[in-house]
C-alpha cells in the first residue's frame, strides 16, 4: 500500500507544474513560493513539499516498464521537473535487450517494472506478457481535505482533479485515471501483501520510528534527511487498521516508540532503554 503514496506523489508533482497552476494567468500566478508550497503540503498531506519530491526521485520510476527517460524533481523549492536525455531501464540491461514502448517488435522482451518483477504473484494480462496491476485512483478526490480546511479554493480543487489523471500499466501518464486489474487486487488482499488489521492484532508490535518526514521542516538540532520517505503517518495508518479490523476494536497490542533527535536511525542507547 506504500505504492499508493508513491504513485499519487508522481501524479501530483507533475500536475503542479502544469500551466494551469504556474503559467502566466495560472491559478498560482502572483503567489509567493511559500504560499504555493503551503498549498502543495496541504494537498499532499505532508509537512511540506519535500516528502513527495523524495518519493518521486527515489521510487517514482520503479513502475516504468522497459526503456524510459527518467523524470525527477530538480529543484526542491519549486518542484521543477527535469528529464534525463539518456534512456534507461530497470532491468539494468542494454536498451536493445528490453521492452521499448516505441518499438512493438520488443513487446515480448523483459519489462522489469515493479509489477513484472513479481509476475509470478500477480499473473499476466490475458494475451500479454505484462503483469496485472494493482494501481488505481478512480474516484480519488485529491486535495479534498485542503479544500475543506480552506487552504485551497474550489477552482484549484477542480482543476487539480481534472489535470492529475493517471498512468497506464507501463507508467506512462494519461488523462484518464489509473485502473487496477481485479485479479491483482484479489491477490494483494488474499496473500497478505495488503496487511490485515485482524491478523496484525494477534501479535505484539513495537513500532520504532525516527524523524524522516521532511528535509525542510525538521526538529531542532537534526540534520535534514536526504530523502524523507519514512513518514509518521504510516504508524497511525497501521493502528487505525488494527482498531477497525480487530475483534477487540482497539490497538493495545501496538506500542509506538519515537526518537526524533537522531533522525531515521535509532540512537545508540536504544538497546539499553528497551530494558
Placement of each model-derived feature along the sequence:
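C-terminal His-loop and adjacent cap/lid subdomain of alpha/beta-hydrolase
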Residues: 1-275
Amino acid at each position: 500500500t506504500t505504492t499508493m503514496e508513491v504513485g499519487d506523489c508522481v501524479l501530483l508533482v507533475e500536475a503542479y507544474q502544469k500551466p494551469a497552476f504556474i503559467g502566466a494567468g495560472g491559478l498560482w500566478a502572483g503567489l509567493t513560493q511559500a504560499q504555493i508550497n503551503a498549498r502543495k503540503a496541504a494537498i499532499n498531506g505532508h509537512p511540506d513539499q519535500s516528502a513527495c519530491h523524495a518519493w518521486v526521485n527515489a521510487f517514482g520510476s520503479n513502475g516504468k516498464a522497459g526503456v524510459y527517460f527518467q523524470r525527477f524533481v530538480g529543484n526542491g523549492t519549486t518542484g521543477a521537473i527535469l528529464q534525463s536525455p539518456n534512456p534507461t531501464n530497470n532491468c539494468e540491461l542494454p536498451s536493445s535487450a528490453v521492452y521499448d514502448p516505441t518499438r512493438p517488435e520488443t513487446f515480448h522482451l523483459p519489462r522489469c517494472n515493479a509489477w513484472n518483477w513479481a509476475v509470478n504473484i500477480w499473473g499476466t494480462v490475458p494475451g500479454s506478457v505484462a503483469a496485472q496491476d494493482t494501481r488505481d485512483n478512480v474516484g480519488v478526490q485529491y486535495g479534498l481535505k485542503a479544500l475543506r480546511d480552506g487552504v485551497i479554493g474550489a477552482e484549484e480543487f477542480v482543476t487539480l482533479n481534472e489535470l492529475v489523471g493517471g498512468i497506464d500499466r507501463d507508467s506512462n501518464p494519461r488523462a484518464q485515471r489509473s485502473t487496477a486489474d481485479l485479479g491483482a487486487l484479489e491477490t494483494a488482499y488474499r496473500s497478505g501483501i495488503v496487511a490485515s488489521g485482524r491478523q496484525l492484532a494477534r501479535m505484539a508490535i513495537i513500532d520504532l520510528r525516527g524523524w524522516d518526514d521532511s528535509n525542510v521542516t525538521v526538529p531542532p538540532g537534526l540534520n535534514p534527511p536526504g530523502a524523507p520517505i519514512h513518514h509518521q503517518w504510516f504508524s497511525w495508518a497501521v493502528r487505525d487498521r488494527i482498531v477497525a479490523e480487530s475483534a477487540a476494536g482497539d490497538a493495545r497490542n501496538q506500542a509506538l516508540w519515537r526518537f526524533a533527535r537522531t533522525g531515521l536511525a535509532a540512537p545508540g542507547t536504544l538497546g539499553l532503554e528497551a530494558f
